[in-house]
Amino acid sequence: MKYILVIGDGMADEPVPELGGLTPLEYAKKPFIDELAAKGEVGNVLNVPDNLPAGSDTAIMSIFGCDPNLYYTGRAPLEAAATGIKLNPGDVAYRCNMVTLESGDLPFEEKRILSHSAGSIDGAVSDEIITELFSDPEFAAVAAKAGMTVNLGHSFRHIAVQSQADIKGISLIPPHDHLGEKIGPLLPTGCKNADTLRELMVKANELLERSPINAKLVADGKMPANGIWFWAEGTAVKLPDFVSKNHHTGAVVSAVPLCHGIAALVGLGIVCPEGATGEIDTNYENKMQATLDILEDNDLSLIHISEPTRRTPNSY
């Protein structure tokens, strides 16, 4: 038997008073989904254990048959696996967002976070800025002392790796949950290494405020990427092999590094069709064709649709 599994990431949402208490999914006109529901079997599943934060990382791990309570170490190691980053014992991976902070002469802690994605910065520009930052002698010296390197990611999402880092007790806060707030109470705390991360964030803001690339972004009416933000920390993770466990081969259709990483860790194939962006402008036709093509030689085709999360202001 052939299987197609569709993940509408964030599609369920929550009841909205303006929609008469319905969720966006309940309110939407969706004749094909309604027909499938009427003719098929419908049920409920808890993809995120009650004791863990709800997110694409924990939910998709569950969907792939990996209990987050047993295997989850953080989001960043999953994204790191997408690009083949190998974490050694003692290494810690962080998501390193390019963000937009208030400009001006305010003390660093008094600045507000204006965008967790630097205005959904273009990937090539984001790569150029983060490369410029880690190549700057001042910043490179601080990063080397911290044992930190950076790996280019997708759009505003980069992966930083710190060797021999002790993160016991550390508290790193997701930036997308605190837009418009002063960053002082949101900065890393909880252990000595938190001070190191804060030092890197302060130095990055100081240097990026002077970046000619950011000056051009501002001149073009765009948000500058004048800060970095560490979160989603975690250590190396090993997930059970999907094929050995379920006796089915398959592949994942997605443009999102998180999905690519989980797929790689469980031994499933990865397909990112032309035009698949992980954003609202993605090419659905190519994604669907890729889903069908996978089934020619496999049992399972999993298509991840991340666009519902992009319709919210807090996509991360």
Which sequence ranges carry the predicted segments?
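Single conserved hydrophobic/aromatic residue that forms the stacking wall/gate
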Residues: 304-316
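Active-site nucleophile/metal-coordination loop of metallo-enzymes that catalyze phosphate/sulfate
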Residues: 12-138
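A residue-level signal for conserved active-site and pocket-lining positions in enzyme catalytic cores
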Residues: 36, 221, 303
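Extreme N-terminal starter segment of soluble prokaryotic enzymes
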Residues: 1-4
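Conserved active-site and cofactor/substrate-binding residues in soluble primary-metabolism enzymes
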Residues: 6, 28-31, 124-128, 195, ...
